Amino acid sequence: MDKKASRIRRATRARRKIAELCATRLVVHRTPRHTYAQVIAPNGSEVIAAASTVEKAIREQLGNTSNKAAAEAIGKLIAERAIEKGITNVAFDRSGFQYHGRVAALAESAREAGLKF
């Protein structure tokens, strides 16, 4: 089993547990160049809020989109957008990625901005 298949297996297991809770989830995905975050409805069919380093305003503001500072900015932005829509409690879905580096930075800044998980 390769690295990607292992990550997807971990993500599937975590998503199954989150689905049992019927909780709104904050999903994080990272690539070598960008970081993405989405708040997804409990039924999984609706994206309530989204933020990523692909957005032009974020790219211009940050310069480098693949570091912890960029992840912190995305965490703050996704929290603001979710709170705007009335979502304060979420389940954190790290998509099988290690809770370290950019994933942890995004989570901590989202917590500081007001999301509870």
Swiss-Prot record:
One Gene Ontology MF term: 5S rRNA binding
Could you say which protein family the record assigns here? Belongs to the universal ribosomal protein uL18 family.
UniProt cross-references to Pfam families, sorted A to Z? Ribosomal_L18p (PF00861)
Enumerate the InterPro entries for this protein: Ribosomal_uL18_bac-type (IPR004389), Ribosomal_uL18_bac/euk (IPR005484)
Q: How does it assemble?
A: Part of the 50S ribosomal subunit; part of the 5S rRNA/L5/L18/L25 subcomplex. Contacts the 5S and 23S rRNAs.
Q: Which SUPFAM superfamilies match?
A: Translational machinery components
BP terms from Gene Ontology: translation
Q: Name one GO cellular component term.
A: cytosolic large ribosomal subunit
Put simply, this protein is called Large ribosomal subunit protein uL18
What are the entry keywords? Answer: Ribonucleoprotein, Ribosomal protein, RNA-binding, rRNA-binding
HAMAP family under this entry? Ribosomal_uL18_B
Matching CDD domains = Ribosomal_L18_L5e (cd00432)
Function, as annotated:
This is one of the proteins that bind and probably mediate the attachment of the 5S RNA into the large ribosomal subunit, where it forms part of the central protuberance.
Q: Name the source's superkingdom.
A: Bacteria
